[in-house]
Amino acid sequence: MKIGIIGVGLMGGSFALDFRSIYKNSKIYGFDVDIKNFQYSIDNKIVDELLSETNCKDLDFLIVSVPVHIIPDVVKKYLDFVGSNTLVIDLGSTKNSICNSLNDHPKRDQFLASHPIAGTENSGPKSAIKGLYTNSINIICCLLYTSPSPRDNTT
C-alpha cells in the first residue's frame, strides 16, 4: 500500500507511525513546508521519501494534515494530481468551509472529510506518537459525497 502525508507533524506523523505498524511493507511519501520537520521525518523513518506530483498518481490514500485555514487550497491542489483510485482524507477540525469549498471540484468524490478526536498540546514530527489514534473517535463528514470506490480502500 502507498500513502502520502502532507504535514508530518503530530497528527500526520502519528498517522504514519500507526499505518507503518499495520502495513509493514507500505511506502509512505511525505511533505512538510518546514524542511527541518521533513528531514526529521525522513531521518526517523516516519516517511520514506518526498511526496511529489508524480508519485501522487499511484497513492491509495493521501492524508492532509495541515492548519485548517489552508486545507481547502491544499486538497484542491492535490486532488488535481492524484489518480482516480486515490482517496484524499483531511485531519482538520472544522468541516463546513472545507467541504463547501470543494463542492464544485471534479474529483470531489475522492475526498473524505474526517475529524479525528485525538492529539496533544505538542506539534511537529518529534511529537508524533505511535498509538495516538488508538481508541479515539474519528468523525466522518459528508460521506454521501465520497465515491464508494475509493472508500473501499479504507477497510
Label every model-predicted segment.
Residues M1-L50:
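NAD(P)+-binding Rossmann beta1-loop-alpha1 motif at the extreme N-terminus of oxidoreductases
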Residues Y29-F31, L51, I89, L112, ...:
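Hydrophobic/aromatic beta-strand patches that form the interior of the parallel beta-sheet core
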Residues N55-L79, L87:
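Rossmann-like NAD(P)-binding element
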Residues V66, G92, C142:
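Glycine-rich, N-terminal phosphate-binding loop of Rossmann-like dinucleotide-binding domains
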Residues V74-K126:
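Rossmann-like NAD(P)(H) cofactor-binding subdomain of soluble oxidoreductases
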Residues K126-S147:
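Short beta-strand and adjoining strand-loop segment in the mid-core
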Residues Y145-T155:
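Single conserved hydrophobic/aromatic residue that forms the stacking wall/gate
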